[in-house]
Amino acid sequence: MAGSGELKLLGVWSSPYAIRVRVVLNLKSLPYEYVEENLGDKSDLLLASNPVHKSVPVLLHAGRPVNESQVIVQYIDEVWPGGAGGRPSVMPSDPYERAVARFWAAYVDDKVRPAWLAILFGSKTEEERAAAVAQAVAALETLEGAFGECSKGKPFFGGDGVGFVDVVLGGYLGWFTAIDKLIGRRLIDPARTPALAAWEERFRATDAAKGVVPDDADKLLEFRQTLLRWSASKAK
């Protein structure tokens, strides 16, 4: 049982990776202290807790740091397993289904993450941005098929409830909203990926995601400009 002060999460409000952890903590109804980090002036606690990558999220459990979002999510699910206290499971109980979920979660970060970064931060020309958008669209079309495989006709990748792949992909949804405004069309297009579009609505509507997954595209795009300025100043 997570007692008062036992769990502390270091994050950034817009980070897809911190969002994943917050969603899972909410799913498990675990009380935690959230500490908003300033990426332009990282705290001593963050630097000491994640000296390798110096990045968020970091989950401090009784003072001990756990790093990297997918690792943190699985850690939470192991320490506070499904069924205990009526908590849901994030990882499937079946070893094969668990392996499949890990495969698709890895696919999201292998394929969606670089496209997301390129669209928002790495594209110097419209041609480069268009290529990154095409990369993201191709990955999402593959995930449309994966949704059918994993969900087995149920509402989420995890079946009846939010699971590992839902959390991993769901962390990006806020920035997808910003990208939609930036490029003038939807990345998760109901005409092209109808199952994913319906899934997005269901995921955003969950109590665990409300107030955690950003929905203000203008605020995100403004923060993007801040990140670009920080990056430019470091390059000088």
Swiss-Prot record:
Per the record, the GO terms for biological process are: glutathione metabolic process
Keyword list (alphabetical) reads: Stress response, Transferase
Q: Pinpoint the GST C-terminal domain residues.
A: 94-228
Which parts form a coiled-coil structure per UniProt?
A: none
Sorted alphabetically, the Gene Ontology cellular component annotations on this record are: cytoplasm
Domain GST N-terminal, chain residue ranges per copy: 5-84
Q: Recount the UniProt induction comment for this entry.
A: By cold stress.
State the superkingdom: Eukaryota
Q: In which tissues is it expressed?
A: Expressed in seedling shoots and roots.
- The record lists glutathione as bound by 15, 42, 56, 68-69
Quote the catalytic activity from the record: RX + glutathione = an S-substituted glutathione + a halide anion + H(+)
Tell me the GO molecular function terms. Answer: glutathione transferase activity
Q: What is its EC number?
A: 2.5.1.18
Similarity section: Belongs to the GST superfamily. Tau family.
Q: Which PANTHER family match?
A: GLUTATHIONE S-TRANSFERASE GSTU6-RELATED, GLUTATHIONE S-TRANSFERASE, GST, SUPERFAMILY, GST DOMAIN CONTAINING
Task: State the function annotated in the UniProt record.
Answer: Conjugation of reduced glutathione to a wide number of exogenous and endogenous hydrophobic electrophiles.
Q: What is this protein called?
A: Probable glutathione S-transferase GSTU6
The gene name reads GSTU6
